[in-house]
């Protein structure tokens, strides 16, 4: 069952859902909360490799992915430019904490999509028990460069109450790849390949 604005306010007041910094009333929609763009990005550095092997036996190594991506910090009153056909990772300003009986769903804003910006390419579900800032997967599928500025409203998170708490809350898992993230982290696909 999706949570309404009334439910979201109640869950936040009870401390069941935490968003830090706390959103203003103008950020709470009928069934979602707007999140803002942070100042940290990761971009692929061209020319490092000819391709990325996603599966064994050639499988990608974690340190190899780190080497493929550069880290970009955007200062106050500056913009991050995403050119047509480019992909980048970004992060929300807000840290989000969910209980074991609530999942989140992240969606881009329609107004930005109409300009060619995909805000979250895949993996829209935020697992129950999540605690951290949220990495965004940007792609510019439009014809013009897009200037994104820290602090702008970039996406919305909605919440769904589970019928019962999960036995595997994300932050409690010793193998959770992205728990407590505070910056956009590159893929940790390599940690999947032992399974």
From Swiss-Prot:
In its keyword annotation, does this UniProt entry include Membrane?
no
Gene3D superfamilies reported for this sequence: 2.70.40.10
| Sequence positions that bind dCTP | 109-114, 127, 135-137, 170, 177, 181
**Entry annotated with the keyword Hydrolase:** yes
The active site is formed by: 137
Top-level taxonomic group? Bacteria
Task of the protein: Catalyzes the deamination of dCTP to dUTP.
What HAMAP family does the annotation carry? dCTP_deaminase
Q: What is the protein's name according to its record?
A: dCTP deaminase
Q: State the species of origin.
A: Rhodospirillum rubrum (strain ATCC 11170 / ATH 1.1.1 / DSM 467 / LMG 4362 / NCIMB 8255 / S1)
């Amino acid at each position: 069952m999706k949570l309404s604005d009334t439910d979201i306010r109640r869950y936040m007041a009870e401390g069941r859902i935490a968003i830090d910094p706390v959103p203003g009333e103008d950020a709470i929609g009928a069934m979602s909360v707007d999140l803002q763009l942070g100042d940290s990005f990761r971009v692929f550095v061209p020319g490092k490799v000819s391709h990325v092997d996603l599966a064994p036996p050639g499988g990608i190594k974690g340190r190899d992915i780190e080497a493929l991506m550069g880290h970009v910090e955007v200062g106050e009153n500056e913009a991050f430019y995403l050119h047509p056909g480019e992909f980048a990772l970004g992060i929300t300003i807000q840290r989000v904490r969910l209980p074991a009986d609530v999942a989140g769903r992240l969606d881009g804003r329609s107004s930005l999509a109409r300009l060619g910006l995909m805000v979250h390419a895949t993996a829209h579900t935020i697992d129950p028990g999540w605690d951290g800032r949220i990495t965004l997967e940007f792609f510019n599928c439009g014809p013009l460069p897009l200037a994104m500025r820290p602090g702008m409203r970039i996406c919305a998170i909605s919440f769904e109450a589970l019928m019962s708490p999960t036995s595997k809350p994300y932050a409690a898992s010793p193998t959770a790849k992205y728990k407590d993230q505070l910056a956009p982290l590159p893929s940790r696909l390599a940690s999947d390949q032992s399974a």
